[in-house]
């Protein structure tokens, strides 16, 4: 059972917390992580690429020349694919790139991502994080107190507006509501910060 130090936002150690072994202490499943991250990245694609077929290109209703007697190859439309400005054959059409992922697989991927950060000693526990005003310097002060890397994601049980605004100016740091974070985001950041509320959420949802 992994045991981590619990800090306050001033960077002072409060106590030690024993985390649930079934969530934070499993052996990360690399194949599941690969599959789920690929699926989540695919779902982010807009899928709006579109080309026009010969039926959709403007013009081309009239036969360019008569069928026989000219010595040239027969043509039915100046918008046929072989013509300059003609329609595209088998071009992209709007589609969804989303891939179905089973709920149990998603949960295993979340557990694997969290356990990976525990093994890498990149998981930080904080009792709570709040800022009195929506100022970036207050959030930077908290990050410095906790000795956080520039590329860190902070997971809270509910996002405070001041905290969200205070972190928006930092390109490498992100504050997310724990219920909204993806496996891809968890793995993209070097350090993961969990509040006690976020840990409780995972223990309720993933067990």
UniProtKB/Swiss-Prot annotation:
InterPro entries: Ribosomal_uL4, Ribosomal_uL4-like, Ribosomal_uL4_dom_sf. Keywords: Ribonucleoprotein, Ribosomal protein, RNA-binding, rRNA-binding. One of its GO terms (molecular function) is rRNA binding. It holds the Pfam family Ribosomal_L4. One of its GO terms (cellular component) is ribosome. The keyword Protease does not apply. Residues 60-71 have a biased composition (Basic residues). The keyword ATP-binding does not apply. Residues 47-78 are annotated as: Disordered. One of its GO terms (biological process) is translation. One of the primary rRNA binding proteins, this protein initially binds near the 5'-end of the 23S rRNA. It is important during the early stages of 50S assembly. It makes multiple contacts with different domains of the 23S rRNA in the assembled 50S subunit and ribosome. Forms part of the polypeptide exit tunnel. Part of the 50S ribosomal subunit. Belongs to the universal ribosomal protein uL4 family. This is Large ribosomal subunit protein uL4.
